[in-house]
Design a protein with these regions (language model features):
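Conserved beta-loop-beta element that borders a ligand/cofactor-binding pocket
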Residues: 132-160
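Substrate-positioning beta->alpha
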Residues: 163-172, 183-207, 215
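NAD(P)-cofactor binding segment of oxidoreductase domains
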Residues: 61, 66-107, 132-134
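N-terminal Rossmann NAD(P)H-binding glycine-rich loop of SDR-like oxidoreductase domains
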Residues: 3-23
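Mid/C-terminal beta-alpha module of Rossmann-like enzyme folds, strongest
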Residues: 205, 209-264, 276-278, 297, ...
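Active-site "gating" loop of Rossmann-like NAD(P)-dependent oxidoreductase/epimerase domains
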Residues: 98-122, 137-142, 159
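Glycine-rich Rossmann NAD(P)(H)-binding loop
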Residues: 6, 156, 184-189, 217-224, ...
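Short-chain dehydrogenase/reductase
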Residues: 109-133, 162-169, 192-193, 224
């Protein structure tokens, strides 16, 4: 099958292209050329910006694909441009959505594909919801099938590991060296990373399998864990000491570090569990890469490419840890002294 991937060089896009090629598909990747890719031989690379409709139109015309996999659409306008260009050419359009589309906190767990999406949790989520709606409105089972996949926290080779204050790789060195790691709240909210190779398998299913058009799919972890467990398991994977976790209330972190806590605001503070049974049944999705194995793979790649920053590249973590410990010690001491 001829498959056209928009954004095939990102973390997840690379995994999807690799699996598509391994499954015997002919793949064309539209990419800006700003990132060195690690795609298999035989992939046709087209340089260009999908935000320029003339570029996308020409690339689709030349490739004449049967299926498009779109990893880089974030709003309704971009979606409608893609629909106008592709609907008379391709048989199926696979759109990479996100679990961000679900309202937080969810009214109940586990979250299914029919759980409420509004009000949006962020501007990013609102854009993705609008894009989904545009694609579903264009769905035609007889000529332009639309499939939407909603991944959660996807990680893997070539990327880093998330933590309360972001995605900087100095977190890894902090874990290794036993330095303070900031954790929001009491560390018991839930999180669920899923390796990109497992997520990519679901995308291949969305390309290949009949009867999946017009549907959305959660493609999510089956190792849901608390944030305390997350850090403990990263440490165990790296043979590091027990992590020095410093628990700081979410609202305090948001107040003192707004630029570092967007993901905390929108996601990390909530306990959410996702139902992925539809993706398993329809797309052949399977969760096969255990989290600690995936951590070792990620860190090995970063080590090989000399991309693990030293722990002290993130002084904010140390400043926050010291300030919070000092203030709580003073607070407790004040009560003990009766002041």
């Amino acid at each position: 099958m001829d498959v056209f991937v928009i954004g095939g060089t990102g973390l997840l896009g690379t995994g999807i292209v690799r699996r598509l090629v391994a499954a015997g598909h002919d793949v064309t990747s539209l990419q800006r050329g700003e990132t060195d890719d690690d795609l298999p031989s035989g992939v046709e690379r087209v340089a260009g910006d999908r935000d320029d409709p003339s570029v996308l139109r020409g690339a689709i015309r030349d490739a004449s694909p049967e299926v498009v996999v779109d990893m880089a659409c974030f709003d309704a306008e971009t979606a409608r441009e893609a629909i106008e260009i592709c609907r008379s050419v391709v048989d199926r359009y696979v759109f990479c959505g996100t679990i961000d589309v679900y309202h937080r906190p969810p009214p109940r767990n586990p979250v299914t594909e029919s759980s409420p999406r509004n009000p949006p949790v962020s501007d990013y989520a609102a854009g993705k919801i609008a894009a989904e709606d545009a694609f579903f409105d264009a769905h035609d089972p007889d000529g332009f099938e639309v499939v939407v996949l909603r991944p959660w926290n996807t990680y893997g080779e070539g990327g880093t590991l998330v933590h309360t204050l972001g995605t900087d790789s100095s977190y890894i060195d902090r874990i290794r060296e036993g330095k303070p790691v900031i954790v929001h709240g009491d560390g018991t909210s839930l999180w669920g990373p899923c390796h990109r190779d497992d997520v990519a398998r679901a995308f291949v299913g969305a390309v290949e399998r009949p009867g999946v058009g017009g549907r959305a799919y959660n493609v999510t972890s089956e190792e849901t864990m608390t944030w305390n467990q997350y850090h403990e398991r990263v440490a165990a994977a790296l043979d590091a000491p027990e992590p020095d976790l410093v628990h700081v209330p979410t609202e305090v972190l948001r107040a003192v570090a707004p630029d570092r806590t967007r993901m905390l605001r929108d996601h990390f503070r909530y306990s959410t569990v996702f139902d992925n049974s539809r993706a398993q049944a329809d797309l052949g999705f399977r969760y096969t890469v255990a989290f600690e194995d995936g951590v070792r793979e990620v860190v090995s790649w970063l080590d090989d490419h000399d991309e693990v920053e030293p722990w002290d590249a993130d002084p904010l973590s140390d400043d926050l840890a010291a300030a919070w410990r000092d203030s709580t010690d003073a607070f407790v001491a004040g009560f003990e002294s009766g002041e």
